[in-house]
């Protein structure tokens, strides 16, 4: 699985150096800017210095791609909000081995998730904005506080939202494209996936009448 590879790649310098196609082409807006020689490469830790990473999907079906062993092209994205730039690391499976083959920088507004990324940037950092973009009610599925082995489902009214609101990553977020073909769809599933603890939070957003709303929170 690509996930198994990328965790090792981000943690193991020797493996990383052996799995990059040096000199590594770096593109800005699809134009070749430079090539990085092996001796100038700085170890890329991706999300290993934090205990989670984030993913964006259009629908549930796309989420199954993570477990698909036949995929041979994956893009790891770093979305930088202040610079409004997306840095893409391209990986291809060559002769059975995952290799990083290029880096590409693109403006955030050119991303297939542009509308959602712009919305999420405000949703994650502005509580007043967040409150205005909640569906009434927000569907909730999460652990039952009275029973460790079962989940509870219910509705969150806007006034009780602050008690449920999860900590949302902001400033810079990750996304991994396992071959999911994004469209400017009216639904996005934003996933915060724990690296070591197996915890996962899913937020389902829908665009209704041009406005993104949080429909569902699953923890």
Report each predicted region and the residues it spans:
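Short, well-ordered alpha-helical segments enriched in acidic and aromatic residues
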Residues: 4-5, 11, 15-40, 129-146
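Short beta-strand edge/turn micro-motifs at domain boundaries
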Residues: 81-111, 198-219
């Amino acid at each position: 699985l690509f996930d198994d590879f990328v965790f090792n790649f981000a943690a193991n310098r020797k493996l990383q150096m052996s799995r990059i196609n040096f000199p590594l082409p770096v593109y800005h807006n699809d134009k070749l800017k430079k090539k990085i020689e092996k001796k100038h490469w700085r170890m890329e830790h991706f999300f290993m210095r934090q205990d989670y990473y984030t993913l964006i999907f259009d629908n549930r079906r796309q989420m199954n791609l993570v477990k698909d062993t036949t995929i041979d092209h994956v893009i790891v994205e770093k979305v930088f909000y202040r610079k409004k730039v997306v840095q893409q690391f391209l990986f291809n499976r060559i002769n059975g081995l995952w290799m990083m083959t290029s880096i590409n920088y693109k403006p955030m507004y050119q991303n297939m998730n542009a509308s959602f990324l712009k919305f999420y940037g405000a949703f994650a950092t502005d509580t007043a904005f967040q409150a205005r973009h909640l569906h009434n009610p927000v569907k909730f599925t999460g652990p039952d506080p009275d029973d460790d082995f079962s989940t509870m489902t219910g509705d969150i009214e806007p006034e009780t939202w602050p008690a449920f609101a999860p900590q949302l990553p902001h400033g810079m977020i990750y996304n991994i494209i396992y071959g999911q073909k994004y469209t400017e769809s009216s639904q996005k599933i934003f996933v915060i996936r724990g690296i070591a603890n197996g915890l996962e939070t899913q937020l389902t957003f829908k665009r209704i009448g041009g406005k993104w709303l949080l429909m569902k929170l699953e923890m």
